[in-house]
Swiss-Prot record:
<keyword id="KW-0663">Pyridoxal phosphate</keyword>
<dbReference type="InterPro" id="IPR015421">
    <property type="entry name" value="PyrdxlP-dep_Trfase_major"/>
</dbReference>
<comment type="subunit">
    <text>Homodimer.</text>
</comment>
<comment type="function">
    <text>Catalyzes the reversible interconversion of serine and glycine with tetrahydrofolate (THF) serving as the one-carbon carrier. This reaction serves as the major source of one-carbon groups required for the biosynthesis of purines, thymidylate, methionine, and other important biomolecules. Also exhibits THF-independent aldolase activity toward beta-hydroxyamino acids, producing glycine and aldehydes, via a retro-aldol mechanism.</text>
</comment>
<feature type="binding site">
    <location>
        <begin position="124"/>
        <end position="126"/>
    </location>
    <ligand>
        <name>(6S)-5,6,7,8-tetrahydrofolate</name>
    </ligand>
</feature>
<dbReference type="GO" id="GO:0019264">
    <property type="term" value="P:glycine biosynthetic process from serine"/>
</dbReference>
<dbReference type="GO" id="GO:0035999">
    <property type="term" value="P:tetrahydrofolate interconversion"/>
</dbReference>
<dbReference type="GO" id="GO:0030170">
    <property type="term" value="F:pyridoxal phosphate binding"/>
</dbReference>
<dbReference type="InterPro" id="IPR001085">
    <property type="entry name" value="Ser_HO-MeTrfase"/>
</dbReference>
<keyword id="KW-0028">Amino-acid biosynthesis</keyword>
<dbReference type="InterPro" id="IPR049943">
    <property type="entry name" value="Ser_HO-MeTrfase-like"/>
</dbReference>
<feature type="binding site">
    <location>
        <begin position="352"/>
        <end position="354"/>
    </location>
    <ligand>
        <name>(6S)-5,6,7,8-tetrahydrofolate</name>
    </ligand>
</feature>
<comment type="pathway">
    <text>Amino-acid biosynthesis; glycine biosynthesis; glycine from L-serine: step 1/1.</text>
</comment>
<dbReference type="Pfam" id="PF00464">
    <property type="entry name" value="SHMT"/>
</dbReference>
<feature type="modified residue" description="N6-(pyridoxal phosphate)lysine">
    <location>
        <position position="229"/>
    </location>
</feature>
<keyword id="KW-0808">Transferase</keyword>
<dbReference type="InterPro" id="IPR039429">
    <property type="entry name" value="SHMT-like_dom"/>
</dbReference>
Length: 412
């Protein structure tokens, strides 16, 4: 269990803020799809004196002396990442998923080259070419999206767009897409136009590690990911690639995109990767998907419309247009009753990104607490009451949320 007694002695204001946040995590139902609860071992690794060490370069090829032990740490993380995903090469130094993506662009593209990435409004990510992101400012970006009738990726239209625009890189991956990605189809399209296939599996990395979602590694030239979310490690990034691209990727990360790696974070990555190699982790990932399907089914039974009519992974998008409430309003009301989620645009949304017509829900964090499919039915009922009868049901909802959180204690 984490300990902040020393912080309390030195900085009571900071200690109070930390305790407030930990209590928030304990006492609210966490449904943000990109969040999770790491193990005590990961927290311990993050707080080690490894944070003191500069280690520019890579194991065995550092620019500083005294790196013989942090070399062991980083090599453990590298070897475990390769083992988990069956990858030929792994770079565990990216500070975030976005920086991992930026490093890949830096490795393969020149300013003005074309990226084909998923439209942010259809479930993509800022770092896949959004105009407000560096990826959308330095490169020409052509978006692809989902079909209007079923909200599945339109692979025929994707192929047509790729042939018309000849992208240097095709990015497969999303931040709000509830269905399985067809990596074989992406590979075929990339080959037809001579593009590098980059897969951003940040959201589904844990599912992939456990074999619950098809792996992109056999199909992609490069795979990026965060190490948190479903993978349940520390906040950070990672790049997997074919051996032929190893030198190019490593150079793009350091010195191309970053300086010294965060060795305490890499240690925490190594710990989480060891956890990901266990049978318990596989069961956990299976339960994430079971819980997501149970929550989605229960919500639809309550009259909620789900984008694509369900989910294959850990997340779902609720279309609130038939509920007379915006995503922003729903997020606020749910937070008032201690249920945390995020407003989210839906495909072909008529609301602004700051208002939205939907909310995104995910099950990694509640599954980490030990919640099961029956609990998902309870959560669905709580969400329904919050949206449909907030004023009359508020006190009852808060009481039921408290009971559920007490049943599954966190960081005690």
């Amino acid at each position: 269990m984490y300990n902040i007694d020393t912080i309390k002695k030195i900085d009571s204001q900071l200690a109070e803020a930390i305790e407030l946040e930990v209590n928030r995590q304990r006492n609210k139902i966490e449904l943000i799809a990109s969040e999770n609860f790491v193990s005590d071992a990961v927290i311990e690794a993050l707080g080690t004196p490894l944070t003191n060490k500069y280690a520019e370069g890579y194991p065995g090829k550092r620019y500083y002396g005294g790196c013989e032990y942090v070399d062991i740490v980083e090599q453990l993380a590298i070897d475990r990442a390769k083992q988990i995903f069956g990858a030929e090469h792994a770079n565990v130094q990216p500070h975030s998923g976005a920086q991992a993506n930026t490093a890949v662009y830096f490795a393969f593209l020149n300013p003005g080259d074309t990226i084909l990435g998923m439209n942010l409004a259809h479930g993509g990510h800022l770092s896949h070419g959004s105009p407000v992101n560096i990826s959308g400012k330095y490169y020409k970006v052509v978006p692809y999206g989902v079909r209007e009738d079923n909200c599945y990726i339109d692979y025929d239209e994707l192929r047509k767009t790729a042939k018309e625009n000849s992208p240097k890189i095709i990015v497969a991956g999303a931040s709000a897409y509830p269905r399985i990605l067809d990596f074989k189809a992406f590979r075929e399209i990339a080959d037809e136009v001579g593009a590098i296939l980059m897969v951003d599996m940040a959201h589904i990395a844990g599912l992939v590690a456990a074999g619950v979602h098809p792996s992109p590694v056999p199909y992609a030239d490069v795979v990026t990911t965060t190490t948190h979310k479903t993978l349940r490690g520390p906040r950070g990034g990672m790049i997997l690639c074919k051996q032929e691209y190893a030198k190019k990727i490593d150079s793009a990360v350091f010195p191309g995109n970053q300086g010294g790696p965060l060795m305490h974070v890499i240690a925490a990555k190594a710990v989480s990767f060891k956890e990901a190699l266990t049978d318990d982790f596989k069961i956990y990932q299976q339960n994430i998907v079971k819980n997501a399907k149970a929550l989605a089914s229960a919500l639809m039974e309550k009259g909620f419309k789900l984008v694509s009519d369900g989910t294959d992974n850990h997340l779902m998008l609720i279309n609130l247009t038939n509920m007379n409430i915006t995503g922003k309003e729903a997020q606020h009301k749910l937070d008032e009753v201690c249920i945390t989620c995020n407003k989210n645009g839906i495909p072909f949304d008529t609301q602004s990104p700051f208002i939205t017509s939907g909310i995104r829900l995910g099950t990694p964090a509640v599954t980490s607490r030990g919640m099961n499919e029956e609990d998902m039915k309870e959560i669905a009922d709580l969400i329904h009451l919050t949206i449909s009868d907030f004023e009359n049901s508020r006190t009852n909802i808060i009481r039921r949320v408290e009971a559920l959180c007490n049943k599954y204690p966190l960081y005690e």
